[in-house]
C-alpha cells in the first residue's frame, strides 16, 4: 500500500494538523484583539490567554481561557474517539494522541511553535485512561488552588497521572506497555523545561485568581 494512502498514516497527519490548530491564539486574536504570541510567555495555551487578555478585560480573559482549555482538550479526545469508533488498533489510538499533542506543541501554522500540550494531552488521556486522568485533574486542582502556579500544578497532575497508571493498570490495557504514556508525558515535560528552571530558582510567576 502506498505510504500516503495508508489510512494510519493519513490519520497521523490529520492528527498533527488538527493538533496544530492554535485555538488560544485564534480566540485571543478575534475576541480580544491581542497577539498572545507576542505577549506574556508567548505560549498559545490557556494560562497565557488568561494572563495577556486579563490586562484588557478580566472577565473576558477567564471566558477565553476556559474556552481554550475546552477546545484544546477536544482536539485530543475527539480524534482518539474517532479512531476507536473506526476500528483502528489500540497502538494507533496512542500514536494519534501523541501526534495531536506534538501538533499542539509544534504547530505547523505558527512556524512550529505552540503550547505546552497539557490540555490536549488531558483530552487524549481522558479517553484512553479516564481513571488516571481524573486523579491527575484532582491533583492539578489542589496544587493550583494552593500555589496558583500553573506550571507546577500541571506537572504535579501529570506526575500523579503517570504514577496512578502503574497502580491502576500495571499491565497497560491493549498495548501492554507504559511506553506510549511515558512518551506523551516526556513531550509535555520537555515543553515545560523553562518553567522547571524557573521553579527551581523560585522565579516562576503565579497566576492571579
From Swiss-Prot:
EC number(s) recorded for this UniProt protein: 2.3.1.275
The protein's annotated pathway: Lipid metabolism; phospholipid metabolism
Membrane topology, as annotated: Multi-pass membrane protein
Origin: domain of life: Bacteria
Subcellular location: Cell inner membrane
Record-level GO BP terms: phospholipid biosynthetic process
A cellular-component GO term for this protein: plasma membrane
Catalytic activity entry: an acyl phosphate + sn-glycerol 3-phosphate = a 1-acyl-sn-glycero-3-phosphate + phosphate
Function: Catalyzes the transfer of an acyl group from acyl-phosphate (acyl-PO(4)) to glycerol-3-phosphate (G3P) to form lysophosphatidic acid (LPA). This enzyme utilizes acyl-phosphate as fatty acyl donor, but not acyl-CoA or acyl-ACP.
Family membership noted in the UniProt record: Belongs to the PlsY family.
Quaternary structure, from the entry: Probably interacts with PlsX.
Protein name: Glycerol-3-phosphate acyltransferase
Gene behind the chain: plsY
Amino acid at each position: 500500500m502506498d505510504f500516503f494512502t495508508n489510512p494510519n498514516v493519513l490519520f497521523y497527519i490529520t492528527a498533527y494538523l488538527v493538533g496544530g490548530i492554535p485555538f488560544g491564539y485564534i480566540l485571543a486574536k478575534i475576541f480580544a484583539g491581542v497577539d498572545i504570541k507576542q505577549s506574556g510567555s508567548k505560549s498559545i495555551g490557556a494560562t497565557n490567554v488568561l494572563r495577556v487578555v486579563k490586562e484588557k478585560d478580566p472577565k473576558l480573559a477567564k471566558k477565553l481561557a476556559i474556552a481554550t482549555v475546552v477546545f484544546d482538550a477536544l482536539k485530543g479526545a475527539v480524534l482518539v474517539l474517532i479512531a476507536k469508533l473506526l476500528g483502528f488498533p489500540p497502538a494507533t489510538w496512542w500514536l494519534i494522541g501523541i501526534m495531536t499533542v506534538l501538533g499542539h506543541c509544534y504547530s505547523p501554522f505558527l512556524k512550529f511553535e505552540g503550547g505546552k500540550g497539557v490540555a490536549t494531552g488531558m483530552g487524549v488521556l481522558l479517553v484512553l485512561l479516564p481513571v488516571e486522568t481524573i486523579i491527575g485533574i484532582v491533583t492539578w486542582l489542589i496544587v493550583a488552588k494552593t500555589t496558583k502556579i500553573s506550571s507546577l500544578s500541571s506537572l504535579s497532575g501529570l506526575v500523579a497521572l503517570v504514577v496512578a497508571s502503574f497502580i491502576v493498570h500495571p499491565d497497560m490495557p491493549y498495548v501492554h506497555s507504559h511506553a506510549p504514556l511515558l512518551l506523551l508525558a516526556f513531550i509535555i515535560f520537555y515543553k515545560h523545561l523553562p518553567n522547571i528552571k524557573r521553579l527551581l530558582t523560585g522565579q516562576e510567576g503565579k497566576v492571579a485568581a
